[in-house]
């Protein structure tokens, strides 16, 4: 029997509320700054009461972009969505098929191939990124959606998670499919894929946010302003040297950039949690 301790309940709830406040307060300050004009943002101290310029600030960056040499912000959002969705679809497809082959196909050195994939997790991004840029440049894929997305579609982490889940499926499923005369791809499409839906949901959320938050890769690959992404665009809004940063516009851009991943997480929240639990079994 679990002993009821009121003081422990009060303490845990207090810490939870404090944690939520610490997380939400910066977002509230960003929201307030997004509703102010330029003069009010630079007032010391800045007011914590929302202003009346939110729609004006949104319209300004939505139409005019985030700088003097910038695409409209709606275009950046579209580029980020195309990049994130393409990376997500590619990662899931490549990882599922590679894990399926490693688990159920019997071929020489299959475990060696898996560990060769897995060991790439130990290589820092800085070690891999410049050779990858060189390859993309040689393939003439700079300033293109293909250059933005293709190099990021392979994932050792996703392959590992799918492999662990596939190994929990009983061998009787394979035998039953073989007796029925099902081909490997028929077995994959009719049995393995439907059983992997919760894992797919979890990896969809993770990989979408991963693709959406990319900063360094677009910065190295893209010079065409019409292919710019939101994260790199926000960084470009912050002035250097003697320039002045329009922090109200920066905060508007940041809040608009937050909306798609937040919506994805909220919509797929339950499936995301189930997928993580199933992957750990």
UniProtKB/Swiss-Prot annotation:
GO terms for cellular component: ATP-binding cassette (ABC) transporter complex, substrate-binding subunit-containing; glycerol-3-phosphate-transporting ATPase complex; membrane; plasma membrane. It is a multi-pass membrane protein. GO terms for molecular function: glycerol-3-phosphate transmembrane transporter activity. The chain crosses the membrane at residues 16-36, 85-105, 113-133, 142-162, 202-222, 247-267. It comes from the Bacteria. GO terms for biological process: glycerol-3-phosphate transmembrane transport. Part of the ABC transporter complex UgpBAEC involved in sn-glycerol-3-phosphate (G3P) import. Probably responsible for the translocation of the substrate across the membrane. Can also transport glycerophosphoryl diesters, which are hydrolyzed to G3P and alcohol during transport. The G3P moiety can be detected in the cytoplasm whereas the corresponding alcohol is usually found in the culture medium. PANTHER family: ABC TRANSPORTER PERMEASE PROTEIN MG189-RELATED-RELATED, SN-GLYCEROL-3-PHOSPHATE TRANSPORT SYSTEM PERMEASE PROTEIN UGPE. This is sn-glycerol-3-phosphate transport system permease protein UgpE. It comes from Escherichia coli (strain K12). The gene is ugpE.
């Amino acid at each position: 029997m679990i002993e009821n301790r009121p003081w422990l309940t009060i303490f845990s709830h207090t810490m939870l509320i404090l944690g939520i406040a610490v997380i939400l307060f910066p977002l509230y300050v960003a929201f307030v700054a997004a509703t102010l004009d330029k003069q009010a943002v630079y007032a010391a101290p800045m007011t914590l009461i929302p202003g009346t310029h939110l729609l004006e600030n949104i319209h300004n960056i939505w139409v005019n972009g985030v700088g003097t040499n910038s695409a409209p912000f709606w275009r950046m959002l579209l580029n980020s969505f195309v990049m994130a969705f393409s990376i997500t679809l590619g990662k899931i497809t490549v990882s599922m098929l590679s894990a399926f082959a490693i688990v159920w196909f019997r071929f020489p050195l299959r475990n060696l191939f898996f560990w060769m994939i897995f060991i790439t997790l130990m290589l820092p991004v800085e070690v891999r990124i410049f050779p990858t840029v060189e390859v993309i440049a040689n393939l003439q894929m700079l300033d293109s959606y293909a250059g933005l997305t293709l190099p990021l579609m392979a994932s050792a982490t996703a392959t590992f998670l799918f492999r662990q889940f596939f190994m929990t499926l009983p061998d009787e499923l394979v035998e039953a499919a073989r007796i029925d005369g099902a081909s490997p791809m028929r077995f994959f499409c009719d049995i393995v894929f439907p059983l992997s839906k919760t894992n797919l949901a979890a990896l969809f959320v993770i990989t979408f946010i991963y693709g959406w938050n990319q900063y360094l890769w677009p910065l190295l690959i893209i010079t065409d302003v019409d292919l710019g992404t939101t994260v790199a665009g926000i960084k470009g809004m912050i002035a250097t040297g003697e320039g002045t940063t329009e922090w109200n516009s920066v905060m508007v851009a940041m809040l608009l950039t937050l909306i798609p991943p937040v919506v994805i997480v909220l919509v797929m929240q339950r499936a995301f949690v189930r997928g993580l639990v199933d992957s750990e079994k």
